[in-house]
Amino acid sequence: MSSAPNGRKKRPSRSTRSSIFQISKPPLQSGDWERRGSGSESAHKTQRALDDCKMLVQEFNTQVALYRELVISIGDVSVSCPSLRAEMHKTRTKGCEMARQAHQKLAAISGPEDGEIHPEICRLYIQLQCCLEMYTTEMLKSICLLGSLQFHRKGKEPGGGTKSLDCKIEESAETPALEDSSSSPVDSQQHSWQVSTDIENTERDMREMKNLLSKLRETMPLPLKNQDDSSLLNLTPYPLVRRRKRRFFGLCCLISS
C-alpha cells in the first residue's frame, strides 16, 4: 500500500474491499430444494385434506339435523305420508354416504400409530362419533313410529275384527295423519307394503351406521380412547402425542399382607 502525503495509509477501494471481504453463501443442493418443496407441499396437502374433512363432517351434521326434523314430522297433519317417506329415504341415503366419506377421509389424515395428533383431528373424531350416534337413534325412532302407525292401520282394516261403535268414533277422532281412512283395500295393502319396505331399508341403514360407528371407535386415536367423555370436550390446543400400547407378559399377582 502507498502512503499518502500526510502520512496516512490509503484505504483499499470499494471494489478491492468487496473482493477481499466477499462472503458468498454456498448454493443449495438439489436435495435440499427437493426436501423443502416436498415438506411444504405435504403440509399443504394435509391442511387441505383436513379442511375438506371438516367441511364434510359439518355437512353430515346438517344432514342429521334435517333427518331429525323429518322424523319429528311423522304423524303431523300437514305432512303427506308418501312425500314424507320419500324425503326421509332421500335424506337418509345422502347422510349415509356422507358418513362413509367422512370416515374414510378422517382415517386417511389420522396418520401413523405413533407421533403427534392435530387437535382438530381429535375434534373431528368426536363430532363424527356424536353425529353417528344421533343418526342411528333417529333411525330407530322412525322405525318405531312407522311400525306403530302401520300396526294401528292394520287394526282398522275389515279383517282386523269387529269393534264397538264408541271405539270406532274415538279412533276416527284420533286417526294419525299418515292414515287415509277413505283408501280402498288394495291401496291399504300397497301402503302397508311400502311402509314395510321403508322400515326394512331403515333397519339396514341403521345396522350399517352402527358398524361404521364401531370402526370409528376402533380407529380412534389412542389419546381419545384413554380419556373419558368429560375430558374429550377440553382438548389441549397443543398437538397430542400418541403413546405406544404397553404389553405385559406373564401374570400380575397381588400379594396381601
Swiss-Prot record:
Motif (Nuclear localization signal): 242-247
GO biological process terms on file: G protein-coupled receptor signaling pathway; negative regulation of signal transduction; regulation of postsynaptic membrane potential
Biased composition regions of type Basic and acidic residues, renumbered to the chain: 32-45
InterPro entries: RGS7BP/RGS9BP
PTM entry text: Palmitoylated. Undergoes rapid palmitoylation turnover. De novo and turnover palmitoylation are both mediated by ZDHHC2. Palmitoylation regulates the cell membrane and nuclear shuttling and the regulation of GPCR signaling. Upon depalmitoylation, it is targeted from the plasma membrane into the nucleus. GPCR signaling inhibits depalmitoylation and promotes localization to the plasma membrane.
Major location category of this protein: nucleus
Disordered as annotated region, ranges: 1-45, 174-196
Record keywords, A-Z: Cell membrane, Cytoplasm, Lipoprotein, Membrane, Nucleus, Palmitate, Signal transduction inhibitor
Topological relation to the membrane, as annotated: Lipid-anchor
Keyword 4Fe-4S (UniProt): no
A GO term from the CC aspect: dendritic shaft
Biased composition (Low complexity): 180-192
Residue positions bearing lipid (S-palmitoyl cysteine): 252-253
Compartment(s) of residence: Nucleus; Cytoplasm; Cell membrane
Iron keyword on record: no
UniProt remark on domains: The nuclear localization signal is both required for nuclear localization and palmitoylation.
Protein family per UniProt: Belongs to the RGS7BP/RGS9BP family.
Function statement: Regulator of G protein-coupled receptor (GPCR) signaling. Regulatory subunit of the R7-Gbeta5 complexes that acts by controlling the subcellular location of the R7-Gbeta5 complexes. When palmitoylated, it targets the R7-Gbeta5 complexes to the plasma membrane, leading to inhibit G protein alpha subunits. When it is unpalmitoylated, the R7-Gbeta5 complexes undergo a nuclear/cytoplasmic shuttling. May also act by controlling the proteolytic stability of R7 proteins, probably by protecting them from degradation.
Record text on subunit structure and interactions: Interacts with 'R7' family proteins RGS6, RGS7, RGS9 and RGS11. Component of some R7-Gbeta5 complex composed of some R7 protein (RGS6, RGS7, RGS9 or RGS11), Gbeta5 (GNB5) and RGS7BP.
Protein name according to UniProt: Regulator of G-protein signaling 7-binding protein
Organism: Homo sapiens
Organism taxonomic ancestry: Eukaryota, Metazoa, Chordata, Craniata, Vertebrata
